[in-house]
Curated annotation (Swiss-Prot):
GO terms for biological process: glutamyl-tRNA aminoacylation. It catalyses: tRNA(Glu) + L-glutamate + ATP = L-glutamyl-tRNA(Glu) + AMP + diphosphate. It is found in: Cytoplasm. This is Glutamate--tRNA ligase 2. Monomer. Belongs to the class-I aminoacyl-tRNA synthetase family. Glutamate--tRNA ligase type 1 subfamily. A motif ('HIGH' region) lies at residues 8-18. It comes from Ruegeria sp. (strain TM1040). Disulfide bonds: none annotated. Its EC number is 6.1.1.17. Catalyzes the attachment of glutamate to tRNA(Glu) in a two-step reaction: glutamate is first activated by ATP to form Glu-AMP and then transferred to the acceptor end of tRNA(Glu). A motif ('KMSKS' region) lies at residues 239-243. Keywords: Aminoacyl-tRNA synthetase, ATP-binding, Cytoplasm, Ligase, Nucleotide-binding, Protein biosynthesis. PANTHER family: GLUTAMATE--TRNA LIGASE, GLUTAMATE--TRNA LIGASE, MITOCHONDRIAL-RELATED.
Length: 441
């Protein structure tokens, strides 16, 4: 059975970059009729917060991304300890004691000599007595996995054939000196224990994947299929990493972005398929194909979400926005007509209130100097109301007959006087909703 996972760290709110990873894994699982696991990477007790666990779940639920089970790494520490013991037994795990300053100095020396900055495995030469002395002086060391210095190869679902020389990679630290288990080994143990068959993540994890493949092999396991998607950039190709804090899903939700607009964009971004609005998740699942994604950096512009949101709102029946209409005071018997007019002229639901204020209170007239006499005369022909769908046609016909104006010279000044805008909804429908026309006096 196809099994995928999304493994966020509860150290902050998830953003569009996280969503891209979550969505790809979710769509693969759902298309195959498989299992999607939400795995909380909470092995860092200082930075992990329960409020962020709740927030992650809320954001995924808002989007309609459902999971089949939840796993928490903090509840699996015994399994990671077992894996570490096995690596020690087979001679693939060793303790190292260098300080960050010492490691940095080594890296600088290697770079100055034109060599790759790879850990030199000096700790392997330490005697037991030297290790005891260092522990007494510095405390417990970190535990590194000893890589076999050979090429690590796999066929990536997006990047194609990958080959990495392990000799160019430092032996990864899997356990810190304070005993904290790091992502690299926790993820390996979880993926094998949980039967994960496909792992989709960012291309910044490629080297990590290479080391994890060796760790899995050392523990006696094969590895899942890997696919590494491109990283997001800003609209001008600039690094997006520094802006991701402003692109949290809850911020987009607060700004009025609708889930299907966001999902429609993220499901196609970086693929050879055009971005098209989809109105339900089943359509996204059916149309998803990991093979259509490329390796080039992918531009993301949050502004693209608003036209998609506007188009999505146009598909909604009035019943789905009743609570929003109630909140701004639209009478129940007016809601259907108001929504029919407003939905074609809003970007987000936040825009509804402005249109209702216009209908309820009227608009500040926009009248050019050369049209003042014309508008004054036209307003004498506009009855008090209430208005209906025929009022605009009858009024403009009367104004045309009285003034001789026609076409744009007739309709545009009247629209601007009534609505304060040069463009907007069909005036027959809008005037029927208006309770006040300020230009009438």
């Amino acid at each position: 059975m196809t099994t995928t996972r999304f493994a966020p760290s509860p150290t902050g709110y998830i953003h569009v970059g996280n969503l891209r990873t979550a969505l790809m894994n979710y769509l693969i699982a759902r298309k195959a009729g498989g299992t999607f696991i939400l795995r909380i990477d909470d092995t860092d007790p200082e930075r992990s917060k329960e409020e962020y666990v709740d927030a992650i779940k809320q954001d995924l639920e808002w989007l309609g991304i459902t999971w089949d089970k939840v796993e928490r790494q903090s509840e699996r520490l015994d399994r990671y300890a077992e894996a570490a013991d096995k690596l020690r037994e087979i001679g693939r795990f060793y303790e190292a004691f260098e300080t960050p300053t010492e490691l940095d100095l080594k890296r600088k020396k290697q770079l100055n000599m034109g060599k790759p900055p790879v850990y030199d495995r000096a700790a392997l030469a330490l005697s037991d007595a030297e290790k005891e002395s260092l522990r007494a002086e510095r405390g417990n060391g970190v535990w590194r996995f000893k890589l076999d210095q050979e090429r690590i190869e796999w066929t990536d679902g997006i990047l194609g054939d990958i080959s990495i020389d392990a000799a160019s990679v430092s032996d990864p630290v899997l356990i810190r000196g304070d005993g904290q288990v790091l992502y690299t080994i926790a993820s390996v143990v979880d993926d094998t224990d949980m039967g994960v068959t496909h792992v989709v993540r960012g291309s910044d994890h490629v080297t990590n994947t290479a080391t994890q493949i060796q760790i899995m092999a050392a523990l006696g396991h094969g590895h899942p299929e890997f696919a590494h998607h491109s990283l997001l950039t800003g609209p001008q190709g600039e690094a997006l990493s520094k802006r991701l804090g402003t692109l949290a899903l809850r911020d987009l939700r607060e700004a009025g972005v609708k889930p299907m607009a966001l999902l429609s964009l993220m499901a196609r971004l970086g693929s050879s398929d055009p971005v098209e609005l989809r109105t339900d998740m089943a359509e996204l699942v059916d149309g998803f194909d990991i093979n259509r994604f490329g390796s080039a950096p992918t531009k993301f512009d949050a502004e693209d979400l608003y036209p998609l949101t506007a188009r999505y709102l146009q598909t909604l029946p009035v019943a789905t926005v009743k609570s929003e209409l109630d909140a701004i005071g639209v009478p129940a018997d007016t809601q259907e007509a108001f929504w029919a007019v407003a939905k074609e002229n809003i970007t987000t639901l936040k825009d509804l209130e402005g249109w209702w204020i216009l209908c309820r209170d009227g608009a500040e007239p926009l009248i050019a100097d050369e049209d003042k006499e014309f508008i004054a005369e036209a307003m004498t022909l506009l009855p008090e109301g209430p208005y209906d769908s025929e009022s605009w046609g009858k009024w403009t016909a009367a104004v045309k007959e009285k003034t001789g104006r026609k076409g744009k010279g007739l309709f545009m000044p009247l629209r601007k006087a009534v609505t304060g805008m040069e463009r907007g909804p069909d005036m027959s429908a809008l005037l029927a909703l208006m309770q006040t026309v300020r230009a009438r006096g």
